[in-house]
């Protein structure tokens, strides 16, 4: 059996992630220690008094990007040896049931980074991210909602989360 799955979610809106994962089946699974989900506000790793997480696009253009510094600091603090960092982005690999099964079976530790604005600074993708995921061919206001979809699909495949294992198929 795989090691217990621990998921750290980095978002500008951690309450959007925590609320749907705190009740019902996933809340009970968390209470029973079958998986651990921790939601963090990226602003907690900023160093300025305004807790600024966004910056203008390098070279100009419309929109803003998530700054790399707080993301690097957060991942450095949370990362373990077996950690995989996943970025929720419309440009990523399309999430499906087989990928959910792969993530559930591997156990270990995931850090899910929820994109926002026009995305994240490219240095984050190049240096930290192991996998870019999308939940479909559409754009959401931020990656928090997408991360809940991924977490729910993965968690229900962990043995013991559902009352009847046949329900996970």
Q: Where in this protein do the model-derived segments appear?
A:
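N-terminal nucleotide/polyanion-binding subdomain common to many enzyme families
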Residues: 1-78
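Solvent-exposed alpha-helices and their adjacent loops that cap or buttress functional pockets
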Residues: 2, 102-106, 132
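Hydrophobic/aromatic beta-strand patches that form the interior of the parallel beta-sheet core
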Residues: 8-10, 38-40, 84-86, 110-111, ...
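Residues at the C-termini of beta-strands that transition into short coil/loop
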Residues: 41-43, 89, 136
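A short acidic, often aromatic-flanked loop/helix-cap motif at beta-alpha or helix-coil junctions
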Residues: 43-48, 93, 139-141
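Short, well-ordered secondary-structure micro-motifs
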Residues: 50, 97-99, 123-125
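S-adenosyl-L-methionine/SAH cofactor-binding core of RNA-modifying enzymes
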Residues: 66-116
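Structured adenosyl-cofactor binding patch, chiefly the S-adenosyl-L-methionine
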Residues: 120, 124-169
């Amino acid at each position: 059996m795989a090691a217990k799955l621990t998921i750290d979610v980095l978002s500008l809106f951690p309450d959007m992630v925590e609320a749907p994962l705190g009740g019902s089946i996933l809340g009970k699974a968390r209470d029973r220690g079958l998986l651990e989900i921790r939601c963090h506000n990226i602003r907690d790793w900023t160093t300025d008094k305004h807790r600024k997480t966004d910056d203008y696009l390098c070279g100009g253009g419309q929109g803003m990007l998530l700054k790399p510094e707080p993301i690097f600091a957060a991942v450095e603090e949370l990362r373990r040896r077996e950690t995989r960092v996943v970025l929720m982005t419309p440009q990523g690999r399309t999430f499906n049931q087989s990928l959910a099964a792969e993530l559930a079976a591997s156990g270990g530790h995931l850090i899910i980074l929820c994109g926002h604005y026009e995305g994240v600074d490219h240095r984050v993708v190049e240096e930290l991210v192991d996998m870019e995921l999308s939940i479909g061919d559409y754009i959401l206001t931020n990656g928090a909602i997408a991360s809940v979809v991924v977490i729910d699909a993965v968690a229900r495949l962990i043995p013991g989360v559902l009352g009847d294992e046949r329900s996970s198929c």
